[in-house]
């Protein structure tokens, strides 16, 4: 799971420290699994004006450039990417800082909290089979597999933002009859290459909106690249991508899909809340650690639709996270979809990463069937209330016994 450090803006009058700003605070998530050395997410207090934020960041940058002595290279780059979610006032920045600068930030009155950045990764595993579309379109299902859905809706008029490794937008799965693509690029916090070097994001996008493998075959998908070709990234990079989505998506007609995760992060969960409050339905993978989803982010965010994985016999997948924060289960074992190595390539893989886009596609499907769009709370209720109950087998350990369902057959 990728977790990048967001660093709040701290003002440094000259080189004077804020020694009397209040009680000494500590960095949250310090030493957490996947912690990235010397990288932090700084979250600023709500209500700060743009000028106050700039004054703070300028002061911290000045302090850092004058006192940073124990770090070299990229680890000591200072104040990096800033973020601001206008829907909630959640704002701050990320960066790499030495110990002295970190303490100056912690002592700054403008700062709400500082969180150590952590690694975020995809939730996928290789395996084999095709059955997911049948499962989510039938209350009771069996081979031969068919997909039943309302073709007049099918995600028309909706956009799903795939926060992942990117999308091969030229893939046949996204091409229309007039030769255009329903897939486009939106944001890239990883590098300067707008391509999917991993395949994971293309696979998820295909399950969401592919013309063969997709739940919502008329939806548009937008690549929000926050993970590298190796399938990992940082919390800071993920939050930056979420910030872009929150500021650019159309409320009540948009879905964010996040098949990734890492250590529990207050910053990442707060970004989920900001997306939700911006009118964007957000669907996330539960995680592949076979543990309580409350321990990881963004699966632990209350405003996310958190999706666990089942296999084709309706049994909870051996790897799937579980617990009361799960909202629904969806197909996540042996899922066939598009792949990024060519415009016709496909691949069968498993993971809660594969379950998540089934439900993201379902969210788009339900939005398109609603006149005038639908807000995240309405779509969350629709997905959980329409789910098939009582069919998940295995030890679900407090998870709701619900399988995502489009209510069609």
Swiss-Prot record:
EC number(s) reported in the record: 3.4.21.-
Annotated signal peptide: 1-21
Domain Inhibitor I9: from-to ranges: 39-122
Predominant location category: secreted
Glycosylation site list: 178, 252
Regulation: Inhibited by PMSF, SSI, the peptide Phe-Val and by Phe, but not by EDTA.
Keyword Cytoplasm annotated: no
Propeptide: 22-123
InterPro entries, A to Z: PCSK9_ProteinaseK-like (IPR034193), Peptidase_S8/S53_dom (IPR000209), Peptidase_S8/S53_dom_sf (IPR036852), Peptidase_S8_Asp-AS (IPR023827), Peptidase_S8_His-AS (IPR022398), Peptidase_S8_Ser-AS (IPR023828), Peptidase_S8_subtilisin-like (IPR050131), Peptidase_S8_subtilisin-rel (IPR015500)
Residue ranges of domain Peptidase S8 in the record: 130-409
Family: Belongs to the peptidase S8 family.
Name of the protein described by the UniProt record: Cuticle-degrading serine protease
Protein source organism: Arthrobotrys oligospora (strain ATCC 24927 / CBS 115.81 / DSM 1491)
